[in-house]
Amino acid sequence: MTNLQDQTQQIVPFIRSLLMPTTGPASIPDDTLEKHTLRSETSTYNLTVGDTGSGLIVFFPGFPGSIVGAHYTLQSNGNYKFDQMLLTAQNLPASYNYCRLVSRSLTVRSSTLPGGVYALNGTINAVTFQGSLSELTDVSYNGLMSATANINDKIGNVLVGEGVTVLSLPTSYDLGYVRLGDPIPAIGLDPKMVATCDSSDRPRVYTITAADDYQFSSQYQPGGVTITLFSANIDAITSLSVGGELVFQTSVHGLVLGATIYLIGFDGTAVITRAVAANNGLTTGTDNLLPFNLVIPTNEITQPITSIKLEIVTSKSGGQAGDQMSWSARGSLAVTIHGGNYPGALRPVTLVAYERVATGSVVTVAGVSNFELIPNPELAKNLVTEYGRFDPGAMNYTKLILSERDRLGIKTVWPTREYTDFREYFMEVADLNSPLKIAGAFGFKDIIRAIRRIAVPVVSTLFPPAAPLAHAIGEGVDYLLGDEAQAASGTARAASGKARAASGRIRQLTLAADKGYEVVANLFQVPQNPVVDGILASPGVLRGAHNLDCVLREGATLFPVVITTVEDAMTPKALNSKMFAVIEGVREDLQPPSQRGSFIRTLSGHRVYGYAPDGVLPLETGRDYTVVPIDDVWDDSIMLSKDPIPPIVGNSGNLAIAYMDVFRPKVPIHVAMTGALNACGEIEKVSFRSTKLATAHRLGLKLAGPGAFDVNTGPNWATFIKRFPHNPRDWDRLPYLNLPYLPPNAGRQYHLAMAASEFKETPELESAVRAMEAAANVDPLFQSALSVFMWLEENGIVTDMANFALSDPNAHRMRNFLANAPQAGSKSQRAKYGTAGYGVEARGPTPEEAQREKDTRISKKMETMGIYFATPEWVALNGHRGPSPGQLKYWQNTREIPDPNEDYLDYVHAEKSRLASEEQILRAATSIYGAPGQAEPPQAFIDEVAKVYEINHGRGPNQEQMKDLLLTAMEMKHRNPRRALPKPKPKPNAPTQRPPGRLGRWIRTVSDEDLE
């Protein structure tokens, strides 16, 4: 799960459940290994709006139990009145002993209108307060917004029709299970006796100094004198206990005290009242002890408690009006809230206030809570439990994502529509292999990518990627490879343990390597002058990132930079690459903060910003320039990168700076340039050719430079400007004789700066080469693999092929490509590509491939719903369909993978039967047996129809049953002598006699009588 190269386990279920609780529960991947079961509990309430149209909903988003929140309505006097508690659908303590909350989300909205109201009005304010409910000082509709300054924890003026969504985000990790206050076996004289086991983990204790030599004095009154000795804020929604004692002293005979403790709710009403002393007489001249020992169970706390009050009633035995009463008191009390300091139990709280909603409207609260639950012994007999899986990578990834939630836009309260829009983004965050397209649109791509790089361990590969080659060699040869394999794959490497010629930059890199710094560098080597062109970066420099920025219609030239690390004093290792743009002027506003303020001077005294101040740039420029990292380039704009990359050192960007200084293009030049231009007009070769080609090709650009690049520009400035494809000048007029960087003798032949080989032979490298040759001689398959690798390197597509391999782990696409590549010389090949070369003919998927794709789609859809057993293989065995309701019920109850093609009807609730009336059955039988006017159906046929209704649980016959009933009716009609007579068939009409033709005026027509 934590390996980015693993394509089969790419989802982090825990963070997906945290950000999208409706996808279902997931085990917390920490090291608390307890056998448990996962369960989702829904909460749905339709709350009626009061007369004022305003109210308040208090949520405890992190409470590990059945309590979700409470609803209060605002009264006309400006005070809130408690309405009801909000709980999960199932009372968890009745069936489970221990619990851990995984995730929770709740939605508040209104979509109903009372009678006489024709428009949905009203707004909602919501805020998450990082404290307890009693600590809020202003709970008015507008005052709530001042409870926090964090913009991601509050929203205001959301229409009630749109609604708000409350998302529970953890405040701590690696927590233990909480006892739910479940009932335990007990026997007592009172049949109503109940014993529960409450949570004692992390209690919250309030210590109250009730009296410190408090002096009371008053005159006698009938019924006694009542005072409030103390009132203090506390928070409790679970069981609590009160302990302590007060000591009273008096000099008045016959004084009698009574003490009462009140537990007061958020609305100011007394929820629980306990008399701790009644008619307690005081003795003069001594200490009178008044102990307190109260236990309040959870089932008596019917609404959130926010304060406690102690009242003392003083009276006098046989007292008369005017008698003096006085006493003094000292002592303290402790109020213990069981489990009150468990993270999320009492803080934070989320308050959702609605205002100006029509009286009588319904505000709907709906949500889901996901738990890890340990069942009680009775339920454990029939419920399968399993261990959670310890996954430090997934846990660290979750912690880092949520620690950056303010920068990633992850809120605790959302407008519901916005939260729905963010679901695809959350799914992308939970998928470690996602390309972060949506995150890039929101501007969070670089942050998440940096977090993945830190949190998720990645399989280390050779660079350029030659991991398939290394694995093919086997363990016997793998240890011989390493840095030398990179040299063999075409990357310039210094011999391990061998010193290079010293220079200032090399010494800087050595110092940086000793300190563990990262180095972003362009490396090239010319004879007798080894130079490292790079960027010195502090450790962990890539951990932060910023949003992207786009620059439109800005002239720029491009050049690639290779990111490397220094493993030892002289051996750099390439890791990645980045494209940079040269822009005219001082444009530090376009640079990441890590590059601002750093510049290097040219020979003419101008500045190039974005470079480290390392000497002088060997160019004569006519103006200042700024070098900025970019992520993409389009027709006339570039996308800037805000990765915290430090300033560049070296000369490989000189070619791009010189071109910018001479031609001053008005739009970005869509060709990247590589090579170091010196003061003599010579262009020096660079190493890491494959890496730089991949950098340019990744952006759809060609790479121009001296040597085997997409555009070979030659070894000097004169040939470069003639061959460069985007040069805007007419070369027939030869206007470049006096250009800067052109040597005095324009006809002088230049030689390549890179005369030496790309890497030096070393004993270790020779051993590695011999080992590979020996393996190739023994294994023909490895010989073929080596030939393929050399072919990839010669054509500069090693990196492209490695990236393609990551996207095609099972080589399905490659097999299809090879299977459908037409042979050279075929008819279709000649028609498309001429007489030579290869191509790919388009074709649709085979039925088997289409079926496999369908199985994969079904499996992915099931996975998004939290149904992980429905793999593509399982779906194929199940008749290429998803799990049935019975299979889902079986998996939810047993957590075992159901057998394909098994319906598990015992796990599906039986359909409720509906009894059909005799009139309905008779009407159906008559309709089926014959048309109106025919004989009535016999009783046997009516009984057959009644059986069908009984089988269908009160529903009429389906198509197959209707066919059977029609056949039965036909048979009964032929056997029944009392069946209606068939209607007579109509006789065919006799042909009419043809009328005689016109015979004339004097001719008589001959009739049959005349013929007789």
Curated annotation (Swiss-Prot):
One Gene Ontology cellular component annotation?
T=13 icosahedral viral capsid
Q: Bias regions of kind Basic residues — which residues? A: 975-986
What organism is recorded for this protein? Avian infectious bursal disease virus (IBDV)
Against SUPFAM superfamilies, the record matches this protein to: Positive stranded ssRNA viruses
InterPro entries, per database record: Birna_VP2, Birna_VP3, Birna_VP3_dom1, Birna_VP3_dom2, Birna_VP4_Prtase_dom, Viral_coat
Q: What is the effect of changing residue 409 to A?
A: In strain: Isolate Indian
Outcome following mutation: residue 312 to V:
In strain: Isolate Indian
Q: What is this protein called?
A: Structural polyprotein
Q: What is the lineage of its organism?
A: Viruses, Riboviria, Orthornavirae, Birnaviridae, Avibirnavirus
- PTM entry text: Specific enzymatic cleavages yield mature proteins. The capsid assembly seems to be regulated by polyprotein processing. The protease VP4 cleaves itself off the polyprotein, thus releasing pre-VP2 and VP3 within the infected cell. During capsid assembly, the C-terminus of pre-VP2 is further processed by VP4, giving rise to VP2, the external capsid protein and three small peptides that all stay closely associated with the capsid.
